[in-house]
Amino acid sequence: PVRVLLLESGEPCNMAYFAPVQLAPEKEDAASASVWRDGSALRAENPRCPYKDVRVTLRCSAPWVSAGTDARFLCGEDSGALRRGFPALAGAFRLEKEAVMLLGTADVPALLDIARAREALAKTKAWWAQRVRGEKYSAAMPESVRRLAPWSAYAALCCRVLGRGSLYQSGGAVGFRDQLQDRINLLPVDAAGARAHILACCAHQYAEGDVQHWYHPTGGEIDKGVRTDCSDDLLWLPWAVCEYVRATADESLCAETAPYLTSPPLARGEHSRYETPSLSGETGTVLDHCHRAAALVLRRGIGEHRLLRMGGGDWNDGFDAMGESAESVWLTWFASGVFHDFS
């Protein structure tokens, strides 16, 4: 992908652009990134990036005034707190009237042409207008809701689904429960996307029934993710299947197949493990995947108050240290609703 910025000014001016570079899962890994000038472009890469051959490029159609490769570009050479380890794509440019700036992992210098950039913007707007057009929403909705719905769908698709981010976190991982909720909420505009995502989630379930709480798609056969004893995430799979079938009447999804993952089960006292699992050699229908999720919830049992156990946290991740005896009112409600719909 590439971000295209169309810049305009009523009079000539200097402008600066600054983008810190991480390109890795952890902030500490940013120190391994390298940034260099390559002709009319700035490029950056990080050997700690989990994706192969990823390189970010910054270009601008306006003349370069200066370029920088770290935070000293903004804060000065004498800033003791900003030594090597804070790499950045940074540049100052002379904007006469209008210009195009490109930043992304795709290097498309042809878009520096202002006419082409405007054409790309028009095509992008048309694509989104078709994707989230208002007539996809129920006429029974209040007019104000129908007017806002396309914008909400646009924001959810861009941020949550494509960007895998949020206001509070931009980790780039796929949250098992989070994106199932996002995809189901977007059924009016992208039922096919919801179907495909349900199948992808099935492929991130362990043979025992639990799931990767979140994972980083790598484009390979198996994604690296975290195995947890979270009590609710696996239940969002049968919930999503029920919601999808109810909305689309497409029961064929239930007969689709997907593999199971395998790894050593979490040891007693081990609440999570970041790992690359293996394929178990087993496959099952979507219906089977849902059955295994429900069965594991029941096997985990109930507590003193006959409520389902909290485990490593329910929908509220902040309850991850409540202990083995903790019970969850919310989880019991949710499971009851899912089991009722699934039956």
Regions picked out by a protein language model, each given a short descriptive name:
Residues 174, 323-334:
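Short, contiguous, pocket-lining structural segments
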Residues 131-173, 196-220, 285-324:
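Extended glycan-interaction surfaces of carbohydrate-active proteins
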Residues 2-5, 180, 233-235:
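Residue-level detector of short, conserved catalytic/binding motifs and their immediate flanks
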Residues 1-2, 337:
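Coil-to-beta-strand transition motifs
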Residues 117, 124, 183-304, 329-336:
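Aromatic-rich carbohydrate-recognition surfaces in CAZymes
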Residues 336-343:
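N-terminal leader/propeptide and maturation segments of large enzyme subunits in energy/redox metabolism
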Residues 3-173, 264-280, 287, 343:
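Acidic/polar, glycine-enriched structural segments that form the non-catalytic walls/loops
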